[in-house]
Amino acid sequence: MDCKLRAKNCGGCPMLGMDYAAQLKQKEETVKKLLGRFGPVEHIRGMETPYHYRNKVISTFTTGWGGKLTSGIYAANSHKVLPVESCLLQDEVLDKTMEAVRAAAIACRYQPYNEDKGTGLLRHCLLRRGVMTGQVMVVLVTAQPVLPGAKNFVKALLTEAEKQSVTITTIVQNVNDRKTSVVLGDMEKVLYGKGFILDTLCGKTYAISPRSFYQINHTQTEVLYGLAVDAAHLTGKEVVLDAYCGIGTIGLTAADHAKQVVGVEVNREAVHDAIGNAKHNGVKNARFFAADATRWIGEAAAAGERADVIFMDPPREGSTPQFIESVARMAPKRVVYVSCNPVTLARDLELLTRKGYKVESSTPVDMFPHSEHIETVCALSKLDIYQKITVNLKMDELDVTAAETKATYEEIREYVKEHTGLNVSDLYIAQVKQKCGIKERQNYNKPKAENPKRLKCPAEKERAIREALKYFKMI
């Protein structure tokens, strides 16, 4: 399937011209090269229909042909806006919603923001859709706090959306008056609805606000989180730490299978959403804290806190050495690392394996078809330093005699000491064994002289050693 925007240097889908099966193979090979040395890499989990999966769209306003307002995306490595009416990756409902936004903005005579001159009103439009609920959010990003004729704009937008058979759930104005490439500003005003939408993921319902981190591919997110929870091997008795928890999606998915879940996230708004999501879903065994994950886990480990399972879902730059050091101090039985960057995942696995963890499996998931990005679920377990390994050996294949299998020199010394109080050396034991006809292995530490002078075992100690040999049924 081809796209007209590719010829215009869109850059959003660098692998679109490649057969999807070939894309999956290439991504799987990439993960194998990076992670194969740590443990087995499973087959990549791809999509049946790898199109129109993005439930979040950000469009930038600009001036089009004839001075008419239009919107689109930035060309690769550029600030030039490419007008977009439809996209092979975007949710088709959101394409229609964006068409309605443009029509309403034109009807209200709004002008696009000019970043060079600092003039104009409309900067961006952020759209979100709950895939399971069908709810749609429109966030209009403006360069100034006042939206002229805001009520008229809302009315026009709802009317235009209805023409497209789209029902809008909420409309929010976000104010970004800074000269920056960051999309959202700090101030928001709800123009219509409640300012958030709901969606269902892995059996839980989530409130999604304009700033919420929520995976953009609903289908593959359920695959990703399902793999993560399965990798935790939860029985209902575990204390689980969900680090970098966002709005609580992984932790709340795991809560039904754990004793307690503790989530940590640096974004306070996300933590607010996570707490609300727990209440909305009736989850009473989950707590959430607004804190830097590295600092929080460091303090928790120093205080003697423990977790049975730790979920890690860090940003693209990966985790930190300090975080991993604290993981080792908390000593969870299992660590489940959800990564969006296999390069930083490989770096962090190097540290985790040095700290006594074994990689059981790594499973790549194609969250972003036609792009080069790869998500990976990595399951790790703590090595048991007391773990016993059963090995079947044939005695006739070893350089060891039948008598030697019955007692070691140390066991003979201990027996003699316990029963007679005498201390006997290995040399004395060897002399007595030789007298008794017990065949010994070759002594690789024997003296260089042919007839070396050596002490002879005293009669009293010889009798004690013979009693030990009889006890161990060696004579």
What residue ranges belong to the model's regions?
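Short cysteine clusters
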Residues: 3-6, 10-13, 340
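Extended interfacial segments that mediate partner engagement and assembly in macromolecular machines
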Residues: 11-112, 127, 132, 146-147
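Short, aliphatic-rich beta-strand segments
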Residues: 127, 134-143, 205-209, 309
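Rossmann-like S-adenosyl-L-methionine
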Residues: 148-401, 409-410
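DNA-recognition alpha helix
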Residues: 408-420, 430-436
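Short Lys/Arg-enriched helix C-cap and helix-to-coil transition segments
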Residues: 440-450
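Phospho-regulated, low-complexity intrinsically disordered regions of nuclear gene-regulatory
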Residues: 454-475
